[in-house]
Amino acid sequence: ADTLIRKVKIAGIAPPTGQDDGEKAEALITAIETLRQTDDDWYMLLTDQDGDDYVKALCAWAEGTEPTEAELGAGEEDHRKFYFGQTDNLSLAVKNRRCALIYTDTENLDEEADAAYLGNVGPFYPQSVTWKFKVPQGITMPAITSAQREALEEANVNFLTEEYKKQYVKNGVCCDGEFIDNQLGADYIASYMREELYAVLLENAKVPYTDAGFALVAGAVFATLNRATDLGIIARDPESDAGVFSVV
């Protein structure tokens, strides 16, 4: 489909250094922020580091990439990110926003389940699709008990499971419990609306503080929300077939 995006950037950095994994994780975050100073035109992040300290640091970093209203008002640009990671820790507790984890057994970490999961569903972006019930290629079913599966669900960690003789990833959620498609959809709306608003400002000699000017701005807002409706991010009214949203 024309909407499928398959752009990948590979950034090589020196191995993180430090006295322990905590310091090395901080060094990795510093390296990522250094990269952003010259190239911030990307959205989703994967790394080859799977240790607990790395995963926790990357999740916290991703959550912090979304600027606050005050920061936006002060002129900070919005280059929010989303982190996909994998873990072999059944007890890992991460509740950050803007990140998603998938569990894999220690001996299968080299299968890179996070990359397989993102590669399986990510190309549909920005179209809204359910991240549950997906079947990434090339990853092994984890050898875990029903109690451990329940614990992973409670912790909002995704995992490959088998139910009714069907294998699929459960539950398609971020670490804070939000569905992945909802978070990605909200980010897309923010990004597309910014593009539309900048187009209005750049293509018009002046956007007056009048009804005509408000109409130009409103046009950008409605164009964004209608686009999100077409992509399935916003639901349609079954009777009118219009997107279910309101602009105040």
Walk through the language-model features, giving the residues of each.
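Surface-exposed assembly/interface segments
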Residues: 1-248
